[in-house]
């Protein structure tokens, strides 16, 4: 139930955005015959977010003449653009001048919210501890004027109902392409081990650390505590002489990367193929969804990450697809509550590893999920493998009329399907594999084969390809390469800098959000690097800042911002 105490009155007004010294003037006007008003006038370009109580939004939004008290210092023109309401939220959008007025009585003060620009007000949908409202930015290229009045005490419980301008979802402003990569905890040991210091962070915008595990009660937990926070790297304290409870391992290295690269974000990836069955009972139960969301946010904050990634492979039917929506909703609410409670003006991210093939994507309520998802990591690979009867391309951009049985799926078809359901293209990252899939005893593309080989179940790292003796070939229609050895009769489908270049062009042409790679261990260094090729081809990488302040982390060195070695 949304009560009258469902909004905050601890601060009369909070303006987000950089304000130069002397750019704001606050004037308290006290009169014996009228209410008290606080006025903030900003004489510079700014973005302002306004949230008002539901009681006000439901019945007390009016357009007032500019002559009334509390009118804006800017333009006095006004016109209602649209008005919508629902059980979840109520919004009213107006242009140039808006006055929101509380009822005036002899013994209670009235007030107003006035903006000389386009504004959307939306209500909270729960108590203060669980804010879930969506705010839309107010923009004025010259000046913005917001007058926040003191509303009647009846609006809140025991305190004046002062509207608070809160941190919202980020505005849809393009800040550069995203170039993300998955980094695995198991990849730090064994053959072909790959350490976090080897990550090409200057070419990346996001690192997704895989994978966290899930308990039966929904608790998200580390799947390898030693790799996460226990392993000592160079310059780490080998004898634990540093005071306090500190994080080492991959977590420390990723935090250091963030400090040195302030546009680099890190995310906790949860699930993956092995842990995906654990999503099923958790997502189906409300209590366990809450546990999942709360514990995921805690682990994210403990590790000093910028968000969470959900990799559920895959919901088996439409019912599980709806459960996925509810799980994402719980996560979004938990992240927003976390930001709100800790006064953090930052939007922590939710990303989803999503399927490209129709067998799995058609079971998802993509439009419902999109409400809570910031980035879609479209897994545009594994189009073929040991489960198929014939060989084929595993990550082709287009279908090939000359090789139809080798291109049963395509990335272009997947992107068009997502777009057709209303998913914004700039939220989609195109997945690129840093591995290949092999087929043995075959005569070529679209042909039968006898096996995939014992080595890695037919999965070969890109940096080992092509195999000695194999010849690299190119499918112009599909924009996809493959290699074939006439002697061993082995075919391997994988990506190269050439195919990655075509994918980068596709990202730009379709105005997608960028690309991501699975996974870091498989790429080459230098000019043959797929990550480097994508980065250089996209050109302008995402410049949005990361977050470094985690005073709630259980690890002392992360709480302190990782001082010293």
Placement of each model-derived feature along the sequence:
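Fungal extracellular serine/threonine-rich, low-complexity, intrinsically disordered "mucin-like" regions
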Residues: 22-169, 539-540
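Surface-exposed amphipathic alpha-helices with a cationic face
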Residues: 170-173, 250-267, 271, 325-344, ...
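Fungal secretory targeting signals
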Residues: 1-32
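Substrate-binding surface in catalytic domains of secreted glycosidases
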Residues: 180, 219-242, 313-465
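Short, acidic/polar
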Residues: 187-202, 284-302, 358-369, 411, ...
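Glycan-recognition patch characteristic of GH18 chitinases/ENGases
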Residues: 166-300, 532, 539-551, 561-565
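Conserved, mostly hydrophobic/aromatic
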Residues: 207, 268, 310, 331, ...
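Glycan-binding loop/region signatures in secreted carbohydrate-active enzymes
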Residues: 167-175, 217-238, 250, 254, ...
């Amino acid at each position: 139930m949304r009560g009258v105490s469902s909004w905050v009155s601890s601060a009369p007004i909070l303006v987000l955005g950089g304000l130069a010294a002397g750019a704001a003037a606050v004037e308290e006007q006290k009169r014996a015959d009228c209410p008290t008003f606080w006025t903030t006038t900003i004489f510079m370009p700014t973005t302002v977010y306004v949230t008002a109580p539901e009681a006000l939004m439901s019945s007390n939004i009016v357009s007032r003449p500019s002559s009334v008290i509390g009118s804006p210092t800017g333009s006095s023109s006004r016109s209602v653009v649209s008005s919508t309401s629902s059980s979840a939220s109520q919004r009213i959008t107006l242009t140039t001048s808006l006055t929101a007025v509380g009822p005036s009585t002899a013994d209670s003060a009235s007030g107003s919210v006035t903006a000389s620009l386009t504004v959307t007000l939306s209500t909270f949908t729960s108590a203060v501890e669980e804010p879930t409202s969506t705010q839309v930015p107010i923009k004025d290229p010259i000046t913005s004027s917001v007058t926040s009045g003191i509303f009647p005490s009846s609006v809140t419980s025991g305190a004046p109902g002062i509207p608070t301008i809160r941190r919202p979802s980020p505005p849809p402003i393009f800040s550069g392409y995203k170039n993300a990569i998955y980094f695995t905890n198991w990849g730090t040991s064994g053959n072909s081990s790959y350490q976090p210091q080897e990550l090409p962070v200057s070419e990346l915008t996001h690192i997704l650390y895989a994978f966290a595990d899930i308990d039966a009660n929904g608790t998200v937990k580390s799947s390898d505590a030693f790799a996460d926070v226990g392993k000592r790297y160079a310059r780490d304290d080998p004898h634990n002489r540093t005071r306090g409870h500190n994080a080492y391992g991959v977590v420390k290295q990723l935090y250091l990367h963030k400090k040195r690269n302030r546009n680099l974000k890190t995310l906790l990836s949860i699930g993956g193929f092995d842990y995906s069955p654990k999503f099923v009972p958790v997502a189906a139960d409300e209590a366990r969804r809450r546990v999942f969301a709360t514990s995921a946010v805690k682990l994210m904050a403990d590790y000093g990450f910028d968000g969470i990634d959900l990799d559920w492979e895959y919901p088996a039917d439409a019912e599980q697809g709806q459960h996925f929506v509810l799980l994402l909703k719980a996560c979004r609410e938990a992240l927003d509550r976390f930001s709100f409670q800790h006064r953090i003006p930052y939007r922590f991210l939710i990303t989803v590893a999503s399927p490209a093939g129709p067998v799995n994507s058609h079971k998802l309520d993509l439009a419902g999920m999109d409400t809570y998802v910031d980035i879609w990591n479209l897994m545009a690979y594994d189009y073929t493998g040991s489960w198929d009867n014939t060989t084929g391309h595993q990550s082709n951009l287009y279908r090939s009329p000359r090789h139809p049985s080798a291109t049963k799926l395509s990335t272009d078809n997947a992107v068009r399907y997502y777009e057709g359901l209303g998913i914004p293209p700039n939220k989609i990252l195109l997945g690129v594999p840093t591995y290949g899939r092999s087929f043995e005893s075959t005569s070529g593309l679209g042909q039968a084969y006898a096996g995939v080989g014992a080595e890695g179940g037919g999965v070969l790292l890109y940096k080992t390809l092509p195999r000695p003796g194999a010849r690299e070939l190119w499918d112009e229609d599909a924009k996809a390469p493959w290699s074939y050895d006439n002697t061993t009769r082995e075919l391997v489908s994988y990506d190269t800098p050439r195919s990655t270049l075509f994918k980068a062009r596709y990202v730009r042409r379709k105005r997608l959000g960028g690309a991501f790679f699975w996974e870091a261990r498989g790429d080459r260094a230098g000019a043959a690097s797929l990550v480097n090729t994508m980065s250089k081809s996209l050109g302008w990488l995402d410049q949005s800042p990361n977050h470094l302040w985690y005073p709630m982390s259980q690890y002392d060195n992360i709480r302190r911002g990782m001082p010293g070695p």
